[in-house]
Amino acid sequence: MIEVENLYKSYGTKEIFKNQSITLDNHCIYALVGVNGIGKSTFLNAITQPYLLDKGVVKIDGIYSSEFQAKYHYAFVPDTKEMFLNLTGKEYLDFVCGLYNQRERCTDLISDYITNLKLENSLDMTIQTYSLGMKQKIYLIGALISNAQNIILDEPFNGLDPESVAVLKGILLSFRDKG
């Protein structure tokens, strides 16, 4: 569960959020919908990076998001795809498995996701050579194999072809249903 209490964020004199509160249950799908520049990405970044908040409290599964242990309760894919560019896809996924101490369960999951999202021929390439859609897929797979109870995705379909969008929707619905 993600609990946001009295979130306040401004950029200069422009208030983005003023005393906003919301509770989001685990294994549910929520979407932030709004016009460009309204603060959707800012909201997601504030949940995962509490030092960006001007005021407010964020708890993830009862743990303050500023505490290190909270990071094991969520996985976040931001809207910018410029992380771990010098790693190959395989190295990145191995890193994520180790980070979340999930090596044993990762192999089968990775294989399924790689096949379903058609990345099997790209794992030995560095992420910097990936297209936007390929980067999106590899980071999404990283979030999904984390075994976190909360998956936070900013612009999850950005750069994906229609077939990959359909596959990802199915994967996310399956994640939700496993609860």
Regions found by a protein language model. Give the residues of each.
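Q-loop/switch helix immediately C-terminal to the Walker
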Residues: T80, N86-N101
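The feature captures the beta-strand-to-loop junction immediately N-terminal to the Walker
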Residues: V33-V35
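Conserved ABC transporter NBD signature motif
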Residues: G56-Y72
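Conserved ABC ATPase "signature" region
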Residues: D94, G98, R105-S122
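Catalytic Walker B motif of ABC-type/P-loop ATPase nucleotide-binding domains
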Residues: I151-E155
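Helix-to-loop junction immediately C-terminal to a conserved catalytic motif
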Residues: T48
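Conserved structural motif at the start of ABC-family nucleotide-binding domains
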Residues: I2, F17-N19, K71
